[in-house]
Structure formats: structure tokens, C-alpha cells
């Protein structure tokens, strides 16, 4: 029998993101401070497009969306909320929030460095946009999961493909 393993990935659950956007739109539609405003959230392939009447209302849209994402368990580190607010048609303002998918090469190296510095008896192998962790004991793998969850990484990690 092969050694137990799992993959460390950084991705967003698309159905959960769709649910969070739908819930945020529902709240925006029903809230008193948004009555008569042109506030909207659109989910595109690689980004979210947030639109509102002015910057203050756009900040409120962001707050509503972030709270719904947090309730649905979506990691906020995979979204770039620091993009600039730009004018849009009809006297509105717009913000494009980039969705980060997968781990870049530096991020996979960071994960393997953390695992190797832990001195646990596990192997970390970079496999494209994920890192495969293998070890003799499941307890060691659980320690790696705990270690990575508690690490202050600039991106969110999920654990998949348990074997």
C-alpha cells in the first residue's frame, strides 16, 4: 500500500462564490440605504465587477460582499480588493476585483519551505499549481495541515485529494 498523501491547493469554490454573490445582491436589493441606487455585483470568469452610485456606496457593497463570502467560508486572500475605483457609465463608479486561482511558483516554494523547516517526516513535491505532501504516518500529515493553516501565508490554502 502506498503512503498517505494529500494536495495543498489555492482555489475558490465557484458554487460558493456564486451563492455569496447572490446573497449579497439580495441584501443590497432589500437594504434601505441602497434603495434607488444602481449598485450591482457581476461575476465574470476571472473577476468580480462591483458597481455603485458613488465610492461610499461602493465601499458598502464591498462590506456586504465580504461578509457573505466570510459566512460561506471563502478565503478573502484570493481576492484583490485593492484595485482602483474607476468611473463607469451613467455617473456610477466601478471596481474590478481580480480572483486569484492556483498557486504561483513562489507560493508553492513557500509551502514546501514551511513543510521542510518543520522537520516532520514528510515529503513535499511541487506538482504545477499544487504541492503534494506524502508521509508514512497520518499524524504527520495532520500536523502539516495544522502548520499550514496557522502559517501567515499571503494566500489561502485548501487541502484536497486525501489518499
Curated annotation (Swiss-Prot):
CDD domains: YajQ_like. Pfam families: DUF520. SUPFAM superfamilies: YajQ-like (SSF89963). Keywords: Nucleotide-binding. GO terms for cellular component: cytosol. It comes from the Bacteria. GO terms for molecular function: nucleotide binding. Coiled coil: none annotated. Nucleotide-binding protein. Belongs to the YajQ family. PANTHER family: UPF0234 PROTEIN YAJQ (PTHR30476:SF0). This is Nucleotide-binding protein LA_3406. It comes from Leptospira interrogans serogroup Icterohaemorrhagiae serovar Lai (strain 56601). The lineage of its organism: Bacteria, Pseudomonadati, Spirochaetota, Spirochaetia, Leptospirales.
Amino acid at each position: 500500500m502506498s503512503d498517505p498523501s494529500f494536495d495543498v491547493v489555492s482555489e475558490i469554490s465557484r458554487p460558493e462564490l456564486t451563492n455569496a454573490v447572490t446573497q449579497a445582491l439580495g441584501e443590497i436589493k432589500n437594504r434601505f440605504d441602497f434603495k434607488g441606487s444602481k449598485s450591482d455585483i457581476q461575476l465574470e470568469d476571472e473577476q468580480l465587477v462591483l458597481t455603485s452610485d458613488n465610492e461610499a456606496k461602493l465601499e458598502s457593497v464591498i462590506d456586504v460582499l465580504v461578509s457573505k463570502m466570510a459566512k460561506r467560508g471563502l478565503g478573502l486572500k484570493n481576492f484583490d480588493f485593492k484595485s482602483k475605483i474607476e468611473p463607469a457609465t451613467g455617473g456610477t463608479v466601478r471596481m474590478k476585483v481580480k480572483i486569484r486561482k492556483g498557486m504561483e511558483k513562489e507560493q508553492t516554494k513557500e509551502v514546501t519551505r514551511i513543510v521542510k523547516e518543520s522537520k516532520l517526516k514528510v515529503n513535499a513535491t511541487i506538482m504545477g499549481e499544487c504541492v503534494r505532501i506524502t508521509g508514512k504516518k497520518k499524524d504527520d500529515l495532520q500536523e502539516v495541515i495544522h502548520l499550514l493553516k496557522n502559517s501567515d501565508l499571503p494566500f489561502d490554502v485548501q487541502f484536497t485529494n486525501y489518499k
